[in-house]
Amino acid sequence: MAEPELQLVARRIRSFPDFPIPGVLFRDISPLLKDPDSFRASIRLLANHLKSKHGGKIDYIAGLDSRGFLFGPSLAQELGLGCVLIRKRGKLPGPTVSASYALEYGKAELEIQKDALEPGQKVVIVDDLLATGGTMCAACQLLGQLRAEVVECVSLVELTSLKGREKLGPVPFFSLLQYE
């Protein structure tokens, strides 16, 4: 990985203690989005990883609602691919399939349009951050319902202490930056 580019990305992640609740250290990507050079570097680094690992064997990038939408289309463009959207329940028109996942208090659902992917198509799921892995795991299950193949999940930031990568089981996972 290009170390100067990775440092450029890392310098644009801010930390806010005790947000949104006491005891949480929030990782803010807003400065990265404000800086076109840092944002381009993050996309280039993710794209280079995917090219080296999968070559031309990816059909689509799937962006997760909502901050995965910030990275998904740009990553797809960098790779010459299309991007499909995985949304929170009730946000997509037409026939959809859904998958539930647990939240701290209750549950949530993700949806994708039934015709978004064909069986056997190879997909990379992208989000800004992996924490507990609940959302990413639900996205993998959702694409499984369409019989698409999730070849990898990627994120800009991974909070390693929350062990979200373990929830993904055998699905490969990659992150640019890791924090406790």
Curated annotation (Swiss-Prot):
InterPro entries given in the database record: Ade_phspho_trans, PRibTrfase_dom, PRTase-like, UPRTase/APRTase
Signal peptide start-end: none
Modified residue annotations for N6-acetyllysine: 114
Residues recorded as bearing Phosphothreonine in the entry: 135
A single GO BP: adenine salvage
Pathway info: Purine metabolism; AMP biosynthesis via salvage pathway; AMP from adenine: step 1/1
GO cellular component: cytoplasm
Modified residues (N-acetylalanine): 2
Main subcellular location of this protein, as a coarse class: cytoplasm
Superkingdom assignment: Eukaryota
E.C. designation(s): 2.4.2.7
Modified-residue entries (Phosphotyrosine), positions: 60
Modified residues (Phosphoserine): 15, 30, 66
Keywords: Acetylation, Cytoplasm, Glycosyltransferase, Phosphoprotein, Purine salvage, Transferase
Compartment(s) where it occurs, according to its Swiss-Prot or TrEMBL record: Cytoplasm
GO molecular function: adenine binding; adenine phosphoribosyltransferase activity; AMP binding
Binding partners and assembly: Homodimer.
Functional summary from the UniProt entry: Catalyzes a salvage reaction resulting in the formation of AMP, that is energically less costly than de novo synthesis.
PANTHER family assigned: ADENINE PHOSPHORIBOSYLTRANSFERASE
Entry similarity comment: Belongs to the purine/pyrimidine phosphoribosyltransferase family.
NCBIfam families: apt, PRK02304.1-3, PRK02304.1-5
Record-given protein name: Adenine phosphoribosyltransferase
